C-alpha cells in the first residue's frame, strides 16, 4: 500500500523561502567574520617606576602589552617574533583553542619555547568565546610584564545582556619589582629553596599609583561623566596574590567572569585571583569629585610573605573643581578576611540555567599542596626548618620534560611522560590537617581521558605550609563550578548541595586553602591541556598536571595537524 503525503503548494513555497533565508543568513554570518593579523615583537625595554629604571620584557615595547579586540566568530593570527634574550611562549587565557592545542602556549606542554631570534605564528579561532579574557607569556616568569587584555565582543548584530555602557575601560592589575630582574627571580629562589622575591608594588595599567614614591604624576586616571555607566574590564595579572578591589563611594555591579555572563549582583568590593577576569558596571552617580580606585592583597596564608602595599588609580569626574584635595580611599577588607572573600564568590551564578553534565563517568579527586623537601646537599635551604619549598597535586610535583608533551603524544615519542598520574590521592589523610604524612615525588605524569567523557573533578585544598587560595586554571576548557566548601570533601554529603541549575562557568577557580571546589566539564576538546595553579611560585614549585584528551571518531572531533613553524626542541 503506497502512502502519499499531500502538502499544499503554499506551504511548500513558504518552507522553501524559510530555508533560503536561513541559508543566506548563515552565509552572511560566515562572510562577516574577520581575520585579524597582529605582529608581537618580544623585546627588552627600560621602564622607570618607584624612582628606579629597570629593563623588562615587553611586547612591541608596551607595558602592559597591546589590547587585542575581536568579535565572537573572528579569527586572529599573531606572529610572535622573539627579539629578546630569553625563551618565550604566549598563552591566550580563556580561549579554548578548539582542536588546536598547538597554539595554546605553555612551554614544554604544548610546544617548546620560541628561542631568541626565532618566531612562531599563533592561531586563535574565537568560536565560542565572548567577554573579557587576556593573553600572557607562559614561560618562566615572563608573564609579569608580557601580558595584555583580550576583548571579545558579542557576535556582530548582537548586544550585551546589560545596558550598553557609555565607555569601556580595561584595568590590568599587575606587579612591579624595583631592582630585581624578573626573569632571574625563580632561579634565585630555586638555588636557596626559599620563597621568591616579593614585589615592591602592585600596579593598575602599569602604574603603581598615588601612594608610592615617584609615582603620583603618572597615576592612571579614569575620567567619567556624572550619570553615565561604564564597563570596567578587570584582569588580575599579578603573579602571586589574590586582590581585593574597590572604588571609593561607588557600588559595583558584577556582570561577567572569565568571559561568561553572570546574574548581576552588586558589591562594594571585588575579590579577584591571579588569572581571573571580571566585567563590572560602574554607575557614575556621585557628586563631582575624584575618588581612589584601589587594590591590595588578600592573603589567607599564615606566616607567608606578601606585598602589603596598595595600588591606586583615580576616578575623576568631569567638572570636578576639588582636584587639589587628596582623593577619597575606598574601604577594602583586611588582607586575611576569608569571610569577605567567600561572601563575594558565593554570589556567582550563571545568567541562565546551563547544561551541566549530570551522568558522570570519570571522577577525579586532586589534593593540591605546598610541600617541604629535604635539600640535596649539606647546606641548609632557606625554607622552613632548613628545607626547600615544593608543591604538588596528588603528591606529584610536576617536572617539565625536555620535549613538549603534545609533540611526544602526537608523534609517539617514548620516555617523555607517563600515563599513571593518580586519579585520587595515593594515600587518604586529613587534607585540612596540619601536616602531610608522606613525602612528595617528582614526575611528568598525565591523565588520559576518552573523548566526550563527563568529568567531575574535586579540587581539595590543604592547610599545610602556609598555603592560601589556589586559583586553578584549566587550559582548553571552561567548567561549571557546581560546589565549594570548607573542610575535607565528603562524597556522600557534599554533592547533595551541588548547584546543577545555574552554576558559574569559569576557566580559573579559587580553591580554599582548607576546603574544596567541585567542577564538571565534558572532555570534548581533543589535545594536551595543562591544569595548574596561577600563583606563579606554586606553579614553579610543581603545582601542575596535564590532561590528554583522545581524538573523537570524526574529523571535526580530532586535533588539527601541527603547523610547519612549530618551534624545535
Curated annotation (Swiss-Prot):
Cu cation 4 binds at residues 470, 533, 538, 543. Its cofactor is Cu cation. The keyword Oxidoreductase applies. Cu cation 2 binds at residues 93, 136, 534. It comes from the Eukaryota. Residues 1-33 form the signal peptide. Its EC number is 1.10.3.2. Expressed at low levels in flowers and siliques. It is an enzyme of class 1 (oxidoreductase). SUPFAM superfamilies: Cupredoxins. It catalyses: 4 hydroquinone + O2 = 4 benzosemiquinone + 2 H2O. Its main location: secreted. GO terms for molecular function: copper ion binding; hydroquinone:oxygen oxidoreductase activity. Pfam families: Cu-oxidase, Cu-oxidase_2, Cu-oxidase_3. The keyword Cytoplasm does not apply. GO terms for cellular component: apoplast. Keywords: Apoplast, Copper, Glycoprotein, Lignin degradation, Metal-binding, Oxidoreductase, Repeat, Secreted, Signal. GO terms for biological process: lignin catabolic process. Cu cation 3 binds at residues 138, 475, 532. It is found in: Secreted, Extracellular space, Apoplast. Glycans are attached at residues 87, 190, 249, 336, 374, 395, 430, 452. InterPro entries: Cu-oxidase-like_N, Cu-oxidase_2nd, Cu-oxidase_C, Cu-oxidase_fam, Cu_oxidase_CS, Cu_oxidase_Cu_BS, Cupredoxin, CuRO_1_LCC. Cu cation 1 binds at residues 91, 473. Lignin degradation and detoxification of lignin-derived products. Belongs to the multicopper oxidase family. This is Laccase-14. It comes from Arabidopsis thaliana. The lineage of its organism: Eukaryota, Viridiplantae, Streptophyta, Embryophyta, Tracheophyta. The gene is LAC14.
Amino acid at each position: 500500500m503506497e502512502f502519499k503525503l499531500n502538502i499544499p503548494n503554499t506551504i511548500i513555497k513558504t518552507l522553501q523561502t524559510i530555508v533560503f533565508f536561513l541559508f543566506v543568513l548563515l552565509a552572511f554570518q560566515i562572510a562577516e567574520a574577520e581575520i585579524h593579523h597582529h605582529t608581537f615583537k618580544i623585546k627588552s625595554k627600560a621602564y622607570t617606576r618607584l624612582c628606579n629604571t629597570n629593563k623588562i620584557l615587553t611586547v612591541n615595547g608596551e607595558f602592559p602589552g597591546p589590547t587585542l579586540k575581536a568579535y565572537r566568530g573572528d579569527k586572529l593570527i599573531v606572529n610572535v617574533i622573539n627579539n629578546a634574550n630569553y625563551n618565550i611562549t604566549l598563552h591566550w587565557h580563556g580561549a579554548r583553542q578548539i582542536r588546536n592545542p598547538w597554539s595554546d602556549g605553555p612551554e614544554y606542554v604544548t610546544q617548546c619555547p620560541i628561542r631568541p631570534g626565532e618566531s612562531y605564528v599563533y592561531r586563535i579561532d574565537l568560536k565560542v568565546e565572548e567577554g573579557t579574557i587576556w593573553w600572557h607569556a607562559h614561560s618562566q616568569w615572563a608573564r609579569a610584564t608580557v601580558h595584555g587584555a583580550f576583548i571579545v565582543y558579542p557576535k556582530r548584530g548582537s548586544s550585551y545582556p546589560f545596558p550598553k555602557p557609555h565607555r569601556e575601560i580595561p584595568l590590568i592589575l599587575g606587579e612591579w619589582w624595583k631592582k630585581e630582574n624578573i626573569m632571574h627571580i625563580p632561579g634565585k629562589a630555586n638555588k636557596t629553596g626559599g620563597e621568591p622575591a616579593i614585589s615592591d608594588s602592585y600596579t593598575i595599567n602599569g602604574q603603581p599609583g598615588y601612594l608610592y614614591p615617584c609615582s603620583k604624576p603618572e597615576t592612571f586616571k579614569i575620567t567619567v561623566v556624572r550619570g553615565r555607566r561604564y564597563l570596567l574590564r578587570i584582569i588580575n595579572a599579578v603573579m602571586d596574590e589574590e586582590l581585593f578591589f574597590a572604588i571609593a563611594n561607588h557600588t559595583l555591579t558584577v556582570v561577567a567572569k572569565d568571559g561568561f555572563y553572570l546574574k548581576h549582583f552588586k558589591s562594594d568590593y571585588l575579590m579577584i585571583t591571579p588569572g581571573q577576569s571580571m566585567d563590572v558596571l560602574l554607575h557614575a552617580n556621585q557628586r563631582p569629585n575624584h575618588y581612589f580606585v584601589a587594590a591590595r592583597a588578600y592573603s589567607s596564608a599564615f606566616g607567608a610573605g606578601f606585598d602589603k602595599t596598595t595600588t591606586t588609580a583615580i576616578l575623576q569626574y568631569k567638572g570636578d573643581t576639588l582636584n587639589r584635595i587628596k582623593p577619597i580611599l575606598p574601604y577594602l577588607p583586611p588582607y586575611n578576611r576569608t569571610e569577605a572573600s567567600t561572601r563575594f564568590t558565593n554570589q556567582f551564578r550563571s545568567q541562565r540555567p546551563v547544561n551541566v553534565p549530570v551522568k558522570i563517568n570519570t571522577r577525579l579527586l586532586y589534593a593540591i599542596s605546598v610541600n617541604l623537601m629535604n635539600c640535596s646537599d649539606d647546606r641548609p635551604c632557606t625554607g622552613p626548618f632548613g628545607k626547600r619549598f615544593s608543591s604538588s597535586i596528588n603528591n606529584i610535583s610536576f617536572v617539565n620534560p625536555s620535549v613538549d608533551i603534545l609533540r611526544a603524544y602526537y608523534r609517539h615519542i617514548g620516555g617523555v611522560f607517563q600515563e599513571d598520574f593518580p586519579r585520587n590521592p595515593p594515600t587518604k589523610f586529613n587534607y585540612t590537617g596540619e601536616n602531610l604524612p608522606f613525602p612528595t615525588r617528582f614526575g611528568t605524569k598525565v591523565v588520559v581521558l576518552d573523548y566526550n567523557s563527563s568529568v567531575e573533578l574535586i579540587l581539595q585544598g590543604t592547610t599545610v605550609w602556609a598555603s592560601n587560595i589556589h586559583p586553578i586554571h584549566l587550559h582548553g576548557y571552561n567548567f561549571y563550578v557546581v560546589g565549594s566548601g570548607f573542610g575535607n570533601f565528603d562524597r556522600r554529603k557534599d554533592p547533595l548541595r551541588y548547584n546543577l541549575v545555574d552554576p558559574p562557568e569559569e576557566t580559573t577557580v579559587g580553591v580554599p586553602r582548607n576546603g574544596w571546589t567541585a567542577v564538571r566539564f565534558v572532555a570534548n576538546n581533543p589535545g594536551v591541556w595543562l591544569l595548574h595553579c596561577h600563583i606563579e611560585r606554586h606553579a614553579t614549585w610543581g603545582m601542575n598536571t596535564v590532561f590528554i584528551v583522545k581524538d573523537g571518531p570524526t574529523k571535526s572531533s580530532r586535533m588539527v595537524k601541527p603547523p610547519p613553524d612549530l618551534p624545535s626542541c
